[in-house]
From Swiss-Prot:
Record-annotated active site: E455
Its biological purpose: Acts as a processive, ATP-dependent zinc metallopeptidase for both cytoplasmic and membrane proteins. Plays a role in the quality control of integral membrane proteins.
Residues in the Periplasmic compartment per record: 66-141
Major enzyme class: hydrolase
GO terms classed as biological process: protein catabolic process; proteolysis
Disulfides per UniProt: none
Species this chain originates from: Methylococcus capsulatus (strain ATCC 33009 / NCIMB 11132 / Bath)
Name of the protein described by the UniProt record: ATP-dependent zinc metalloprotease FtsH
Gene Ontology CC: one annotated term: plasma membrane
EC number of this enzyme: 3.4.24.-
């Protein structure tokens, strides 16, 4: 009876040895490490292998391309003429180098396909050619460089791309990219969200449904399937969603709408299915989709890529999942967008996103609360009044206020102050509104005088017209990309409507700078370009959208697609005739000309005040609103 060997076969031993060496190399290089560091190292290794193999492949191809292919007859002629320096003869090819044809030239590498010739060796010896004969073919190197190396390169490149797209978790996990917020992460609660009291009140009901879903079921109702947060950028929509999860104490699945769309077809739908499957397994929980418009755009647009639209497939899967899951399991779907106008109607119907909560720009009291929240860890000087700061930042959202507080801290540090003062907040607000000061942009005396007259015209008209907002500051220090000066007005109170008189006063204030230049210098300059654009826009809105034209009457003309929360206007649909267009142009021109005539009368009547204000502005470069009022009172007395 034959005995079986206790030793493994040589191939098996070789495999085990190579495997041990590979595992040891992985351990020493840190490739087995878990987490982002291990992923980064493995991705780098794949990238290095790609570079090395690509270099070898290119070098082999370069070596092949260097050899000039010549006919066999030309090779025989070169041998006969003694122009062959050396040769390598195989069964398939003859390669080598030809001697330089002239002094100073280099040798020429060549390759040719031979015919069977017994006299070739004798001829080479006769001419003194160094030659080598190699039996067998180079099939192995051809196999390596023509097949194996390209396949390995493509495989490594595909693997590297897949790992980058899936966060380093491998190709098979490409449809699973949902991130769940770790329980150890710092919890965000409503105490960390200032303002937005109405939104927080509605979201508290969502928290109650998550914590006690049977309460509404006992009355025969059901908890809302979806909550959509809409509002301008920076108002805290994502922060509110995190606060809901923190208050409810449930897992929080957070994914951006853009993460559903990848290079591969079907990935978006797979990620939607995986997202809802994870949510069911971790119920009660919250699914939060940020920037929903990335996948929720209305269907029916132009067909792309041969009739298949990955975004529409992802949206269809999302609609199916929101219809299919049971609301009694305690899964709340929340989403945020600042473009609700472009969302698909099927996504917004009842039974999917039942509630739409507007997170709008904060009012005065909310801005005070937000400033207190963002400055609670800052060292503030005694002269800082956050209510005054809030009054001077109308239209600022939470992100803008946080940026203003941080800019004030940076300015205070730059000045080596022990605490942040009111002047630092003023400088920070000016920087955000008008851009940083350009002290290197020096104006000559003539330009400085013209800018001072221009800004004085704005400020003077703003203080004289009946509904003008008070002037807070006038400056002729260049700021931002192109502004050579600015006049800052701040409202006394929050306003949500504008009357016809207020709009006409705004046009007059905008035309004040150009008219002041014409009055003092006899001509205007290019500095009034932006003023004219804004004045023309207000006048056209009055005529076409607000019905403030007696000739055209209370009608609207033209339909323009608008993104309300982004202040972006699309193409205008013209729904009026050429004759009406001429009437619109005439009415707009009439409003502008009436404004110009009105401003000329104001500035002519207050010419002394204009000159004094311009002189003060040239001297100080920055004049406060109190100084402007003092000059007006002094000139009037």
């Amino acid at each position: 009876m034959a005995k079986h060997s206790q030793h493994s076969s040589p191939p098996r031993k070789l495999f085990d040895t190579l495997n041990d060496l590979w595992q040891r190399a992985k351990s020493e290089a840190g490739l087995s490490a878990e987490g982002p560091e291990g992923t980064r190292r493995r991705n780098n290794l794949i990238l290095y292998l790609l570079l090395v193999l690509s270099t070898l492949y290119l070098l082999n191809g370069y070596q092949t391309l260097r050899n000039e292919e010549i006919p066999y007859s030309e090779f025989l002629k070169a041998v006969a003429e003694g122009r062959v320096e050396q040769a390598v003869v195989t069964e398939q090819t003859i390669s080598g180098t030809l001697k330089p044809e002239a002094e100073g030239e280099s040798t020429r590498p060549f390759i040719t396909v031979p015919l069977w010739n017994h006299e070739l060796a004798a001829e080479l010896e006769k001419k003194g050619v160094k030659y080598t004969v190699r039996y067998g073919s180079n099939w192995f190197s051809s196999l390596i460089f023509n097949w194996i190396v390209p396949i390995v390169l493509l495989t490594l490149f595909w693997t590297w791309m897949a790992r980058r797209m899936t966060g380093g978790r491998g190709f098979l996990s490409i449809g699973k990219k949902t991130r769940i917020q770790a329980d150890t992460a710092a919890k965000v609660t409503f105490g960390d969200v200032a303002g937005a009291d109405e939104a927080k009140q509605e979201l508290r009901e969502t928290i109650e449904f998550l914590q006690n879903p049977t309460r509404i079921q006992s009355l025969g109702g059901r908890m809302p399937k979806g909550v959509l947060l809409v509002g301008p950028p920076g108002t805290g929509k994502t922060l509110l969603a995190r606060a809901v999860a923190g208050e409810a104490g449930v897992p929080f699945f957070n994914i951006s709408g853009s993460e559903f769309i990848e290079l591969f077809v079907g990935v978006g739908a797979a990620r939607v299915r995986d997202l809802f499957e994870q949510a069911r397994q971790n119920a009660p929980c919250i699914i939060f989709i940020d920037e929903l418009d990335a996948i929720g755009r209305s269907r029916g647009g132009p067909v792309v890529m041969g009739g298949h639209d990955e975004r529409e497939q992802t949206l269809n899967q999302l609609l199916t999942e929101m219809d299919g899951f049971d609301p009694s399991v305690g899964v709340a779907v929340m989403a945020a967008t600042n473009r609700p106008e472009i969302l698909d109607k099927a996504l917004l119907r009842s039974g999917r996103f039942d509630r739409q909560i507007v997170v709008d720009k904060p009012g005065l009291e909310d801005r005070v609360s937000i400033l207190k929240l963002h400055t609670r860890k800052m060292k503030l000087a005694a002269d800082v009044d956050l209510r005054v700061v809030a009054q001077r930042t109308p239209g600022f959202v939470g992100a803008d206020l946080a940026n203003a507080a941080n800019e004030a801290a940076i300015i205070a540090v730059r000045a080596n102050k022990a605490a942040i003062g009111m002047a630092d907040f003023e400088a920070a607000i000016d920087r955000i509104l008008a851009g940083p000061e350009k002290k290197s942009r020096l104006l000559n005396d003539a330009e400085k005088h013209r800018v001072a007259v221009h800004e004085s015209g704005h400020a003077l008209v703003a203080e004289i017209v009946p509904t003008g907002q008070p002037v807070h500051k006038v400056s002729i220090i260049p700021r931002g990309a192109a502004a050579l000066g600015f006049t800052l007005q701040l409202p006394v109170e929050e306003k949500f409507l504008s009357t016809e008189q207020e709009l006409k006063d705004q046009i007059a204030i905008l035309l004040g700078g150009r008219t002041a230049e014409e009055l003092v210098f006899g001509e205007s300059s290019s500095g009034a370009q932006n003023d004219l654009e804004k004045a023309s826009e207000i006048a056209r809105t009055m005529v076409c959208s607000l019905g403030m034209s007696k000739v055209l009457g209370p009608l609207t003309y033209g339909r323009r697609q608008q993104l309300a929360y982004l202040s972006v206007e699309g193409a205008e649909e013209r729904n009026f005739s050429e004759e009406t267009a001429r009437l619109i142009d005439n009415e707009v021109r009439k409003l502008i000309e009436e404004g110009l005539q009105r401003v000329r009368e104001i500035l002519t009547h207050h010419r002394v005040t204009l000159d004094r204000l311009a002189a003060l502005l040239r001297e100080k470069e920055v004049v406060s609103g109190e100084d402007v009022k003092a000059v007006i009172r002094e000139a009037a007395s």
